[in-house]
Swiss-Prot record:
InterPro entries: BlueCu_1, BlueCu_1_BS, Copper_blue_Plastocyanin, Cupredoxin, Plastocyanin. Participates in electron transfer between P700 and the cytochrome b6-f complex in photosystem I. The sequence shown is that of plastocyanin B'. It comes from Nicotiana tabacum. Cu cation binds at H37, C84, H87, M92. This is Plastocyanin B'/B''. It is found in: Plastid, Chloroplast thylakoid membrane. One of its GO terms (molecular function) is electron transfer activity. PROSITE patterns: COPPER_BLUE (PS00196). Belongs to the plastocyanin family.
Length: 99
């Protein structure tokens, strides 16, 4: 599945913001708007035993240009909340359920 970082109208959002994947399915986050974005999984909002640092971008790393991507594969079933570190305060948060 491809998830856009930033809506077509420049909104600070993940599109889609709430989605499901199968365990082992690749998720590609793609910068859509040209604002600097990243993908950080919330260590308190992921399945127990999953290391957030192994699936997240560093909070300092950014996808700066349109078309830049970050891919991750989640193998542990459950619900994962993620956010864009620079824009978390603006509500740029998403959720993926791994089945």
């Amino acid at each position: 599945i491809e998830v856009l970082l930033g809506s077509d109208d420049g909104g600070l959002a993940f599109v889609p913001g709430n989605f499901s994947v199968s365990a082992g399915e690749k998720i590609t986050f793609k910068n859509n708007a040209g604002f600097p974005h990243n993908v950080v999984f919330d260590e308190d909002e992921i399945p127990a035993g999953v290391d957030a640092s192994k699936i997240s971008m560093s909070e300092e790393d950014l996808l700066n240009g349109p078309g830049e991507t970050y891919s991750v594969t989640l193998s542990e079933k459950g619900t994962y909340t993620f956010y864009c570190a620079p824009h978390q305060g603006a509500g740029m948060v998403g959720k993926v359920t791994v089945n």
